[in-house]
């Protein structure tokens, strides 16, 4: 599984040496099954120095309202060459029971020190966002089983996909002929999504769904 990090903050530059965030997140998304008490996510620090790990769940990057999930521990120090487990707990709430719901798990890693071997360094905080999908107990099948139910429509330089299923369909790849539709990420349950087509894209539409495993 690949880890995609987004750079969110940088401190003072003292030399060319840089402390790179090396914390490994043990997953690219989380499926939270409604009939379980909690889900978990491993974090590992392969570096010899420590990081502060801050974690939380939100609905959207621009929506900081309270969600029905808490992460424990929310803030802790992860020593060098150690690992820990983040636990995600559903605190209750009126979530839909006929379809999946999408939240985002945020993990911010902050170097706990600005020095390595007495060399001043640039401290960088890294935030990783991965999908947290709440799956009601009534949904017992795998999403990929219903991938054939997706319907696609092309209009000018746009491609629209309709999803009549109760599952989030996450795309690993969408292609029109030999052209890759780079902004095709996912489509929500009982909904549709529209993506921009590459210039001169021609041919059949092909797609791949990311499975739970």
PLM region spans:
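Terminal connector regions
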Residues: 93-145, 202-213
């Amino acid at each position: 599984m690949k880890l995609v990090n987004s750079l969110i903050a940088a401190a003072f530059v003292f030399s060319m040496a840089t402390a790179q965030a090396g914390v490994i997140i043990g997953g690219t998304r989380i499926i939270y099954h409604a009939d379980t008490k909690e889900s978990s996510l491993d974090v590992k620090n392969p570096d010899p120095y420590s990081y502060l790990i801050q974690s939380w769940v939100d609905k959207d990057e621009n929506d900081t309202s309270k969600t029905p999930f808490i992460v424990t521990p929310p803030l802790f120090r992860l020593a060098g060459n150690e690992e820990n487990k983040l636990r995600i707990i559903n605190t209750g709430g009126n979530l839909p029971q006929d379809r999946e719901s999408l939240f985002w798990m945020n993990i911010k890693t902050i170097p706990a020190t600005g020095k390595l071997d007495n060399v001043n360094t640039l401290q960088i905080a890294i935030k990783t966002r991965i999908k947290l999908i709440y799956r009601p107990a009534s949904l017992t099948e795998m999403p990929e089983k219903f991938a054939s139910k997706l319907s696609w429509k092309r209009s000018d330089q746009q491609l629209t996909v309709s999803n009549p299923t109760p599952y989030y369909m996450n795309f690993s790849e969408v292609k029109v002929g030999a052209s890759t539709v780079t902004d095709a990420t996912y489509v929500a349950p009982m909904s549709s999504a529209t993506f921009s087509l590459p210039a001169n894209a021609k041919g059949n539409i092909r797609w791949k769904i990311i499975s739970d495993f």
